[in-house]
Amino acid sequence: MNEKLALNDDILMKIEKPARYIGNEVNAVVKDRDSIDVRFCMCFPDVYEIGMSHLGIQILYGMLNSWDDVWCERVYSPWVDLDEIMRKENIPLFALESQDPIKDFDFLGITIQYEMCYTNILQVLDLAGIPLLATERGEDCPIVIGGGPCTYNPEPIADFFDIFYIGEGETQYRPLIDLYKKCRTEKTGREEFLRRAAKLPGMYVPRFYETTYHENGTIASFRPTEEGIPARIRKELVTDMTDSFYPMKPVVPYIKVTQDRVVLEIQRGCIRGCRFCQAGQLYRPVRERDVEVLKKYAMEMLKNTGHEEISLSSLSSSDYSKLPELIDFLIEECDKRHINISLPSLRIDAFSLDVMSKVQDVKKSSLTFAPEAGSQRLRDVINKGLTEEVILQGSALAFEGGWTRVKLYFMLGHPTETEEDIRGIAELSNKIAATFFDTVPKEKRVNGRVQIVTSTSFFVPKPFTPFQWAPQCTKEEFVEKAYLTRKAISEQLNQKSIKYNWHEADVSVLEGVLARGDRKLSQVLLYVYNKGCFYDAWSEYFHNDVWMEAFEACSLDPDFYSHRERPLDEILPWDFLDCGVSRAFLEREWQKAKNETISPNCKQACQGCGAARFGCGICVEPRD
C-alpha cells in the first residue's frame, strides 16, 4: 500500500473517477526505493481508461520491473477536472505506484500513439514541473524519452524530447539503462549521457541534428552536428516473438477501462500491404508466436488477473497460421471457466463465422467489414484485398447464421477518388441490405429488417506508406464528400436499413498536418498549449479556431504540410529514419496505386519491400 496519497480526500471526493489516481491496482508493482538504481515512469498521454488498455505499456512495465535494479511506475494525463485543481494548488504530477513526483525520476517514457495527443505531452511535462523544451532541462530533470508509432516522424515534437526510441521497445532499454548507470557513476553529466545514447541502436537524440530549409519551406538538409552521431537510424525489432518478454501479470484496474480483458498478442505485423496503412508497413516483417506458448500464456494471464474475457491481438488474426488450433483450445478451456473470447481482425468467411457463432451471442453481436473504399477500382488503388463478391458472400453466410447487424468502415478522400467511388459506398451498403432480404425468409427476420451501420473516416496520409507523397483533401472537400455519401445513401432502395456516421473533418486535417510536419510545428504546439489546448483527441475539448490562429501567428500554412502532392525527390522530415521498408519499394507502390495495380500479400509473393534484411518472420519462412 502507498504510505500517503498525493491527493487528499477533499480533492478525491471532488473529481470524476478518483480511482484513476490512487494506484494499488491488482498486479501493480511496488519496490523498495532504496534497493533499486533507476526509477522509470511510463506515461500514456491520455486519460487512464485509454492508457490502461494499451498493450505496449503493459509489456514495457512488466519487462522493466522484471529487472532488480529498475522500478517502473505509471502515469496518465490527469482529466480536465484534476488538471485545474493541480494547477491551482501547485500539486506536481505524480506516479501511481509510489505517488512520488515525476520530477524525482530518472526517466519519463512517453508512448505516442496518436498525433492529436501531442498537446497532452506538454500537459504532462508542465504539470510535472519539467521544462517543455529539452534544451532548457537541467541535470536534475528526468530524461524524457518517446516511443510508439508517432516517433516514425518525431520532428513536430522533437524540441520536447531528449531521446526518441525508434522501433519495438523490448530490445534496447537494457543497454540504455546500463549506459545511464555508467554515466552516473562516472559523473559525466546529462549532455554526455545523451551524446553516448545517440550512438546506441534505435536511439534518436534530436539535439545532435540540424535541419536547413529552402526558401519554399521544404527541407534542404538534415544532418548530425557532431562526429560519431549516425546520419541514419534503423528501427529496433524483436526477431523472435516467442522468446520475447510478455507480461504474465498485467495490471488490473479498479474501474472499467476501454479494453477490460486479457490481451493475447498472437503475432506482430501484417502480410496484407494496404497502401494507406502505416502499421502494416512499420511492423514488417510478420512474426508469429508459437501456439503452445500462447496456450500457456492465455491460461496463466486469466489465472493472474481474474478477467472474464480474453482477446486475440493482431493486425490480421485470420493470417495467424495456427489460428484454428488456438481457437479450438480457447473455446474448450474458456467454456469450462465461463470466459468470453473476443476475436477482432478476422476476415469474414465460413471458418470465422463458425468460430464466432461458438464464442459470441449472435443476437447481441454485430459483424464488421472494412472495405475502406466503395468501388473495386479504388480498392485496387489502396491494395485492399477484399472484393465485393467476398463481402456479399460473407454477408449472406452471416445472415444465414443469425446475424442481423453489420458495421461497414470506409475512408473518404483516398488518392484518385471520384464521385462514382463515393456513390459506391451507398451502393455496397444497399447490396448488403438486399442480401439480407434475399437470404433470410420473412418469418425468420428479427424486427423485420437488418441494420447496416456505414461509417466513414477521412484519409490521412502517413509517413512510411506508399501514400506519404499524396495530397490530403481540404476540410471543405471532406465535408462535400460526406454530404455526397449521405445523399447517395438516402437514394438507395434499402435506405431505411442503413445508418450513416461520419468523422469530424477539422481533426483529420490537423492530424494530417502533424503526421507529416517538420520541426517548425513545435512553435504551433507551444502556442496552442499556452492558449489552453490539450485533450485535442476529444471533440469536446478540440478548438480548431485556436489551432488556425496559431498557424497564422507562427507564419505557417497548414496546407503546405497536408494539401500538396510532394515530389519524389523532396527530402521528407522522416527520411533519416529506416523503418525496414525501402523508399524504392514505397515509390513502386505509389506508382502501382496510380496505375490501379494490386500487389499480392507476403505469403503469396515477396515484393522486395526491404524487411527481409532483418532475417526473421515470414521473410525466412516457407511460403504457402
Per-region residue spans from a language model:
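Radical SAM enzyme core and accessory elements
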Residues: 1-30, 34, 40-42, 491-624
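N-terminal pre-triad scaffold of radical SAM enzymes
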Residues: 40-46, 64, 250-276, 302, ...
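Conserved SAM/AdoMet-binding glycine-rich loop
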Residues: 42-43, 116, 300-407, 411-453, ...
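Flexible loop/turn segments at secondary-structure boundaries
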Residues: 48-51, 80-83, 116-118, 151-154, ...
